[in-house]
């Protein structure tokens, strides 16, 4: 059945405008993005099918171009649209932490770092560079590695911190395994980076480890 043949209150776009986006299911939100279905399937039915094939909305959003376009009803144009939506989301979250003290708004910082790192298939090491009032100057992935390790060089963290005239930094990296518990190697590299940046009067304020649905803070553990 075409969406136009559904009662108005059941059409995703009309429902969103009347009740707000939180009232919609994942399939209804995706249907608005898709706009049209395929032969024999309306946009909601196609969205529901795609969510089952990918396993979740998050997996669909984090899929690469080859995986995304291998599904019927999706193509490069839709992939480009999706990447634009994802990038706008990341920029929106960055703007929120950029305008605030990263320590007095830890939930915004955690949300941003989770969005940036959680769904990466390889380990990535991210640094937030802060000024002397702990406002964000820049955020950057400095190192990327394999599925379970990224080589991290303290001297490069020092160099980039000086480049951005940072007074403090927040470290973060993901565990593609999904388990956020820091390893002994994580603790050692944090200590090495802390020691290195302290030589140029820069402080490490925290190190977040991002897992699947969990985030561990070194500062909250008393390790920094």
From Swiss-Prot:
Annotated residues for binding of Zn(2+): 173, 175, 186
Disulfide partners: none
Pfam annotation, one family: UPF0758_N
Ranges annotated as spanning the membrane: none
Alphabetized GO MF terms: metal ion binding; metallopeptidase activity
Motif JAMM motif in this chain: 173-186
Entry-linked InterPro entries: MPN, RadC_JAB, RuvA_2-like, UPF0758, UPF0758_CS, UPF0758_N
Domain of life the protein comes from: Bacteria
BP term (GO), one: proteolysis
Keywords: Hydrolase, Metal-binding, Metalloprotease, Protease, Zinc
All residue ranges annotated as the MPN domain in the record: 102-224
Record's keyword annotation contains Protease: yes
Similarity remark: Belongs to the UPF0758 family.
Name used for this protein in its record: UPF0758 protein VF_0126
Organism: Aliivibrio fischeri (strain ATCC 700601 / ES114) (Vibrio fischeri)
Lineage: Bacteria, Pseudomonadati, Pseudomonadota, Gammaproteobacteria, Vibrionales
């Amino acid at each position: 059945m075409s969406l136009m043949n559904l009662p108005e209150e059941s059409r995703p776009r009309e429902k969103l405008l009347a009740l707000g986006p939180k009232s919609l299911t994942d399939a209804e939100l995706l249907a608005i993005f898709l706009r049209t279905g395929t032969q024999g399937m309306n946009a909601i039915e196609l969205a529901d099918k795609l969510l089952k094939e990918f396993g979740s909305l998050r997996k669909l959003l984090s899929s690469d171009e080859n995986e995304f376009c291998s599904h019927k009803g999706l193509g490069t144009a839709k992939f480009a649209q999706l990447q634009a939506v994802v990038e706008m989301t990341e920029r929106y979250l960055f703007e929120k932490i950029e305008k605030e003290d990263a320590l007095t708004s830890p939930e915004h910082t955690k949300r941003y770092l989770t969005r940036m790192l959680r769904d990466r298939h390889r380990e990535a090491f991210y640094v937030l560079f802060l000024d002397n009032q702990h406002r964000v100057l820049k955020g950057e992935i400095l190192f990327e590695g394999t599925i379970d390790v990224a080589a991290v060089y303290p001297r490069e963290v020092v160099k980039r911190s000086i480049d951005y005239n940072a007074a403090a930094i927040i470290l973060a990296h993901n565990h593609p395994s999904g388990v956020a518990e820091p390893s002994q190697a994580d603790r050692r590299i944090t200590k090495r980076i802390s020691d290195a940046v302290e030589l140029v009067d820069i402080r490490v304020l925290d190190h977040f480890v991002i897992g699947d649905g969990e985030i561990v803070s070194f500062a909250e553990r008393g390790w920094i």
